[in-house]
Amino acid sequence: MADFDSPPKLSGVQPPSEGVGGGRCSEISAELIRSLTELQELETVYERLCGEEKVVERELDALLEQQNTIESKMVTLHRMGPNLQLIEGDAKQLAGMITFTCNLAENVSSKVRQLDLAKNRLYQAIQRADDILDLKFCMDGVQTALRNEDYEQAAAHIHRYLCLDKSVIELSRQGKEGSMIDANLKLLQEAEQRLKAIVAEKFAVATKEGDLPQVERFFKIFPLLGLHEEGLRKFSEYLCKQVASKAEENLLMVLGTDMSDRRAAVIFADTLTLLFEGIARIVETHQPIVETYYGPGRLYTLIKYLQVECDRQVEKVVDKFIKQRDYHQQFRHVQNNLMRNSTTEKIEPRELDPILTEVTLMNARSELYLRFLKKRISSDFEVGDSMASEEVKQEHQKCLDKLLNNCLLSCTMQELIGLYVTMEEYFMRETVNKAVALDTYEKGQLTSSMVDDVFYIVKKCIGRALSSSSIDCLCAMINLATTELESDFRDVLCNKLRMGFPATTFQDIQRGVTSAVNIMHSSLQQGKFDTKGIESTDEAKMSFLVTLNNVEVCSENISTLKKTLESDCTKLFSQGIGGEQAQAKFDSCLSDLAAVSNKFRDLLQEGLTELNSTAIKPQVQPWINSFFSVSHNIEEEEFNDYEANDPWVQQFILNLEQQMAEFKASLSPVIYDSLTGLMTSLVTVELEKVVLKSTFNRLGGLQFDKELRSLIAYLTTVTTWTIRDKFARLSQMATILNLERVTEILDYWGPNSGPLTWRLTPAEVRQVLALRIDFRSEDIKRLRL
């Protein structure tokens, strides 16, 4: 008997799965059922069989539900039968037509291939016949031409022979007429060698005699004989001799030039110019010959040889320039002078001026010449590279860059410009120092002499660097000028402003004198500039105001200089000078220059703040404090009396007008406007403080409103700035002080404010309302703002 406490273990019996498709057998076999003897096992199997039965019933029900759908689809299939038979017939017919067309096309294409093969063989036969005839014609023609000394015609026959297809000639030699062809070939080869020797000899004689027509005649024959490189080399040697002869003649003429001559200061630049112009004329004259007879891309070879000779002659001219102008010695003196602790006697900057001008002119002529070569070679390469690969184009570009950048001319000019930058720096620094030391002020002028002098010098130095046509040189000088203006020259103006505007109180005078003594002591220790003592208060005032004008003009001059440089360099870049990298470098230098202009503006603002706090604030504060002496808790009679005899604002306006008159005559309009703006801000701040410490009644508030309107009207006439915004808080205070009752503020506050933007906070509004002695504090506290 089985143990009924443990569950039955029916090996291999699994519960039936739901939704399995029909046609499957039960997983419980009849043999398994017969083998069961326990009631519990039989009940378990029975339950599983019942479950399988239910699944089968559901599947049968599902199939029966699909009966109508299946029957309708079968009817549709029966109806489609005839149509499918027609389609089958059409498809078979189409397949037959395609097979027929394919066979026909295959037959036709095979015929066409046979025709193409026959045509190609015919062309080859004709070509072979033509080449044999050409060979015979060339052999006969070259012999005749040589006898008649018609070297051009002989070269044309040789060129035609050289252009024949060698494989066709080789096939012809293997035919029946091979011996005759061999004989013709031998004669042609002998004629070729003979003609090459004749042309070389005739060319040498022509160059020796300087017979240009004969030189050009035989120069044109070289490429017909396949001697492109040799022809260009020999012709270049001839041209180089001419260049050398003319250059030596010009150099001798230069060395004999009298120093009183009008062009004596630039004779070496003129010599280089003549050299470059001579080579440029040679290139322009012979470029058509080279392109016509040698083909595109060959001009580079000719110019490469010419540039070698150009480098030799440039080296001679520059050596003479360095020796005669004492260029290296001058540079060493300048280097020593630039050292802070140098004891070497200083060179007078005027002595350097003509040398620096000549160097920049020499470099400008060199840059122009190199741009000419670049343009000519590039255009020649473009014609030949129209169908070339990208690799060939890049290789040609590398050759061009190497020729222009690595030639001795470029290296020599770079060396000269490198020394020039240091010497130009010395020239600029020394002349700026001299302009500062000789600074003078003429009565009636807003600025002193050093501003115009310094910027004339800076513009001259930068303009000279610009005339060199070297972006690197220009950027170096812009950077040096930026440093000179930012450090040394700005320090001079800064020191003058730090001496302060002469004060009126004892404490301010003491502070100003101490500051001035410290600054003068520091300047004298540095040894940069001489500091002259201030002999009187008036002179000190004028010095401060003139310095403010100087600072403002400096800022404007720097901005103008930046715009001018942008315009001038746009022309340079449009001429192909420099590239994207040079453009970025130049833009960076201009950004630094613009930053210096901003620093001068900042210095101007510092000076104005000092002037405002030293000269204006000590005067304005007592005038505003006199507001306390005028009661604003008044009756109708006093209000009418105030209207006839204003107790405060008219005197205050008169005091301001007298105070600002001194500055208006001595300051530029821009600075005066800025100073008036600072004064206005000061007035609003101080007046607000006074008002918040005063008390008012209704008529007193009305009186204050009239006073404020008069003050605003006056200040509006003396400045171009919009000042109503500065008085917004005070105007709103006047509005509040004019209210008839406390709750009237709600007509102007919050949603009822309209376009008005309140500058006063709710707490400040309550504070102003509390200034009215006739308003109860309980009413003010009850306001919901």
Curated annotation (Swiss-Prot):
Compartments where found: Cytoplasm, Cytosol; Golgi apparatus membrane
Chain spans, region Disordered: 1-24
UniProt main location, coarse: cytoplasm
Residues where N-acetylalanine is found: A2
Keywords (A to Z) from UniProt: Acetylation, Cytoplasm, Golgi apparatus, Membrane, Phosphoprotein, Protein transport, Transport
Family annotation (InterPro entries): COG4, COG4_C, COG4_M, COG4_N
Segments for region (D domain): 618-740
Positions of modified residues (Phosphoserine): S6
GO cellular component: cytosol; Golgi membrane; Golgi transport complex
KW Phosphoprotein (keyword) present: yes
Topology in the lipid bilayer: Peripheral membrane protein
Region Interaction with SCFD1: start-end pairs: 2-84
Region described as E domain: spans on this chain: 741-785
UniProt GO BP: Golgi organization; protein transport; retrograde vesicle-mediated transport, Golgi to endoplasmic reticulum
Residue span of region Interaction with STX5: 85-153
Complex and partners: Monomer. Component of the conserved oligomeric Golgi (COG) complex which is composed of eight different subunits and is required for normal Golgi morphology and localization. Mediates interaction of SCFD1 with the COG complex. Interacts with STX5.
Family classification: Belongs to the COG4 family.
Function summary: Required for normal Golgi function. Plays a role in SNARE-pin assembly and Golgi-to-ER retrograde transport via its interaction with SCFD1.
Name this polypeptide is given: Conserved oligomeric Golgi complex subunit 4
Source organism of the structure: Pongo abelii (Sumatran orangutan)
Gene name, Swiss-Prot/TrEMBL: COG4
